[in-house]
From Swiss-Prot:
Keywords: Aminoacyl-tRNA synthetase, ATP-binding, Coiled coil, Cytoplasm, Ligase, Nucleotide-binding, Protein biosynthesis. GO terms for molecular function: aminoacyl-tRNA deacylase activity; ATP binding; valine-tRNA ligase activity. This is Valine--tRNA ligase. HAMAP family: Val_tRNA_synth_type1. The keyword Ribonucleoprotein does not apply. Its main location: cytoplasm. GO terms for biological process: valyl-tRNA aminoacylation. InterPro entries: aa-tRNA-synth_I_CS (IPR001412), aa-tRNA-synth_Ia (IPR002300), Anticodon_Ia_Val (IPR033705), M/V/L/I-tRNA-synth_anticd-bd (IPR013155), Rossmann-like_a/b/a_fold (IPR014729), tRNA-bd_arm (IPR010978), tRNAsynth_Ia_anticodon-bd (IPR009080), Val/Leu/Ile-tRNA-synth_edit (IPR009008). ValRS has two distinct active sites: one for aminoacylation and one for editing. The misactivated threonine is translocated from the active site to the editing site. Pfam families: Anticodon_1, tRNA-synt_1. Belongs to the class-I aminoacyl-tRNA synthetase family. ValS type 1 subfamily.
Length: 839
């Protein structure tokens, strides 16, 4: 066994061995199932540090449950990531001077599949480096044939049941990527902007007007109304009156609607088709829809003089025109929220066009009913931490219908067909030669939303599906609760009449050392493969696991990674020490001590095992990590090994340490696999815990360690060498007359581990749990304490003199506050009292 831990040697070929031996792809159907769906990473590129954290948490659970005797299934897969992957592929084609217009959709699809295969292979290599216990025999892809069948089938089901409809509605549109977006694919970004206060003149009046504020004058041509709040008394006299659009000169009427906020600006709002809230008002008031911006972000012919201008260019020209006509009252510099596409980081326009939607109201009710049913925990998802259940609840109460169609070529084609008359048929196969399939594809989250059962080969009604659905837990970050978790939740209830997973562990994000989100723009991203190359996968895993608290972010820290490596190195050194132990005794120690020490460490191990099993159910990994660290550094290394050094306990110490390696395996799979084989010449994943029995009362060891620890702390405090003898006495607190049958054994261990001798008296008292420890003051300490005492006397003399001088000063007494004088007097009294005591 090598003297120094080398992660490159230890981790080499381990994952390949686990796959070859089918440790995680062979299933014992007599055991209780435990299943996890791996959140399918996008095939847009390589895995980042967040993926490493997410998969490490799941790998721990899978390995731990296997250790506990479960039949584990960890379903791997990748996501086709429609918009994101298509953008990457199109960029590659441009770099290769290939124009997508020169390729058919089928050829583009093949190019994307080439991309997918390339990056899926890269992702699998990264999974291997991390040591993930995935069942690769069950690997899936959200755009494979089985997924396509599942997607088509559930789309048809939802349509027939009235949950999917095609409607001409306002949607967010990405003018760069040329596709519609769902409400949660856009973000509000605060930017410097201008607020224009425009004059809307009362019809047939040259003097009376109302002021209406807008940040987007380019939408003026689509104005169809002005509104005030129904309770707005200040502006109520304008209700039903006509006003002149300052740009088009068309007449628009003043209406009332709750959307207008009284006392905000003038309290009057203009209504156009290029705002989601405005569109809702248009529907409520049954008004006309006029669009002035097209899907390319350019102006329509609603006003011919601005046609084909970009919206920003049109804004500049419209403002100039209105200024010339004195129709702008004022312009303010403000910060406003601009709606941006999260996909392309460009402005998302609100356009009205026919799209496919899922009605969210009935599904919101389904989830809310589950959440609010406190008496049926076995039938609802348990969130860790629970606050995310409340966050999901709030979102579901406000959910809009989900726009599921995308104007892309990469994705699941919508199983809808049109004839020449515009009739629609929704079915999985073509109705005939005169029918053309819808050219749009489905939102990526549609296929990943059904993954908990489609990856188990639904719609096949197999034993495989029945056994592993619902999955045991989903592990994901809080930033995709609405994108993914909510959709899996209602899709599972709808299709399977059951929740998709029993528990949801929601973790945070990994931030840099300054607490900033990692991003390409900041250049603060960290490649997990670089960390594995330098420190090893186990060091990275330990850092990620032991810094994990449900719902909270992690701040990346190189010092903590290095601390993880140091801990692993200590485990290596302990294992090497145990392997090199000679069975022949080198030191004769009482057999009673050896047996008690063995029993004591066994109890510590069993308690640790119970804690790990219990805390893993609630995902308290940081708590587990602290207890493991304590067991290694304090219980095993500082106490147990020190006690049994030189005994013939090699067999026991080897077995208890091997048991610990098995228990530690879910945290550090590479290291423990390697060390277990070194000690036992047997594979860890083919082994059970050694049966070890406890025969002694462990209070004896606990009491002795408490005494030794106190003596060691005293040495540290006064910087006393271990060579200097300490002298102590023990007095039982509970019963001073009771004979301590273990006293001689205690004396032996205290002498061995603390170099302290039992004596008849002591000047310093330490109160312990069951004893009063009385310690004689060593001469070295007496000298140091005398030096400290003299320094304190000199300090007190100086302070007393200073305080007396201040209090005898009439100016101080007359000018200082009563509180200040009182404080100084109290200070003097305290100093005099201490001086008399210490002298």
């Amino acid at each position: 066994m090598e003297k120094i831990y080398n992660h490159k040697i230890v981790e080499k070929d381990k994952n390949e061995k686990w796959i070859k031996k089918e440790y995680f792809s062979t299933h014992d159907l007599t055991k209780k199932p435990f299943s996890i769906l791996l959140p399918p990473p996008n095939v847009t590129g390589k895995l980042h540090i967040g993926h490493a954290w997410n998969t490490t948490l799941q790998d721990f659970l899978i390995r731990l449950k296997r250790l506990q005797g479960y039949d584990v299934l960890w379903l791997p897969g990748t996501d086709h990531a429609g918009i994101a992957t298509q953008a990457k592929v199109e960029k590659r084609l441009l770099d290769q001077k290939i124009f997508k217009s020169d390729l058919t959709k089928e050829e583009l699809f093949e190019k994307a599949m080439d991309w997918k295969n390339e990056y899926a292979n890269e992702i699998k290599k990264q999974w291997s480096k991390l040591g993930l216990a995935l069942d690769y025999k069950k690997e899936r892809f959200t755009l494979d044939e089985l997924s396509n069948k599942a997607v088509n089938d559930i789309f048809v089901m939802l349509y027939k049941d009235g949950y999917i409809y095609r409607g001409n509605r306002a949607i967010y549109y990405d003018t760069f990527l040329q596709t519609s977006l769902s409400n949660i694919e856009v973000i509000n970004v605060e930017k410097e902007s201008k607020m224009y206060y425009l004059k809307y003149f009362l019809e047939n009046s040259n003097s009376e007007y109302v002021l209406v504020a807008t940040t987007r004058p380019e939408t003026l041509a689509s104005d169809v109304a002005l509104i005030i709040n129904p309770n707005d008394k200040k502006n109520s006299h304008y209700l039903g009156k006509n006003f002149v659009n300052p740009l088009t000169k068309k007449i628009i009427k003043m209406h009332s609607d709750d959307y207008a906020i009284m006392n905000f600006g003038s309290g009057i709002v203009k209504i156009s088709a290029h705002d989601m809230n405005d569109f809702d008002v248009i529907k409520r008031l049954n008004l006309e829809v006029i669009e002035t911006i097209d899907k390319f972000g350019k102006m329509t012919n609603a006003i011919p003089e601005f046609e084909n201008m970009s919206s920003l260019e049109a804004r500049e020209n419209i403002v100039l025109k209105l200024k010339k006509e004195n129709l702008i009252d004022k312009i303010e510099n403000i910060k406003s929220n601009i709606i941006m596409s999260e996909r392309s980081n460009t402005v998302a326009e609100v356009l009205v066009m026919p799209q496919w939607f899922i009605k969210m109201e009935p599904f919101s009710k389904m989830i809310l009913k589950k959440i609010q049913n406190e008496n049926e925990d076995d039938k609802k998802v348990l969130f860790f931490p629970k606050k995310f259940e409340n966050i999901l609840k709030i979102w579901m109460q406000e959910a809009h219908d989900w726009n599921i169609s995308r104007q892309l070529w990469w994705g699941h084609k919508i199983p809808a067909w049109y004839d020449e008359k515009g009739n629609i048929k929704v079915q999985t196969t073509s109705p005939g030669s005169n029918w053309t399939q819808d050219q749009d594809v489905l939102d990526t989250w549609f296929s990943s939303g059904i993954a908990p059962f489609s990856f188990l080969n639904w719609p096949q009604k197999s034993e495989f599906l029945k056994r592993y659905y619902p999955t045991s837990v989903i592990v994901t970050a809080y930033d995709i609760i609405f994108f993914w978790v909510a959709r899996m939740y209602f899709m599972g209830i709808y299709s399977m009449k059951n929740i998709p997973f029993k528990k949801a562990l929601i973790h945070g994000l990994i931030r840099d050392e300054q607490g900033r989100k990692m991003s390409k723009s900041l250049g603060n991203g960290i490649d997990p493969m670089d960390l594995i190359e330098k420190y090893g996968a186990d060091s990275l895993r330990w850092f990620l696991m032991t810094n994990s608290t449900p719902g909270q972010d992690i701040r990346f820290n190189y010092d903590k990674i290095e601390s993880a490596w140091s801990l692993i190195n200590k485990i290596w050194n302990i294992s090497r020490y145990i392997k090199m132990l000679d069975s022949d005794k080198k030191e004769i120690i009482p057999e009673e001590i050896e047996q008690n020490a063995n029993s004591w460490i066994l109890e510590k191990f069993e308690n640790l095992k119970i804690l790990i099993y219990e805390k893993s159910e609630t995902f308290e990994f940081s708590v587990i990590g602290k207890e493991i660290f304590k067991f290694i550094n304090e219980d095993f290394s500082s106490v147990y090994i020190e006690i049994i050094k030189g005994t013939d306990s090699k067999e026991f110490i080897s077995k208890i340490w091997s048991n610990f390696l098995i228990l530690l395996h879910p945290f550090l799979p590479f290291l423990t696999d390697h060390l277990y084989f070194e000690l036992n010449k047997k594979e860890l994943l083919e082994s059970d815990f050694f049966e070890l029995k406890s025969r002694k009362n462990n209070l004896f060891i606990d009491e002795t360690i408490e005494i030794i620890s106190t003596l060691r702390e005293y040495r540290t405090r006064f910087n006393l060498s271990h060579k200097i003898d300490l002298n102590y006495n023990l007095v039982s607190i509970n019963n001073s007359n009771q004979c301590d049958f273990n006293l001689d054994l205690k004396k032996y261990l205290i002498k061995k581990m603390a170099n302290a001798n039992f004596s008849e008296n002591g000047q310093i008292f330490f109160k312990l749990n069951n004893y009063e420890l009385r310690l004689q003051i060593p001469e070295e300490v007496k000298k140091e304490e005398e030096t400290i005492r003299i320094k304190r006397i000199l300090f007190l003399e100086s302070e007393i003199k200073r305080s007396q001088s201040i209090l005898s000063n009439e100016k101080f007494i007359n000018n200082a506050s009563e509180i200040k004088v009182k404080e100084e007097k109290e200070k003097l009294e305290k100093y005099i009292k201490e001086f008399e005591e210490i002298k």
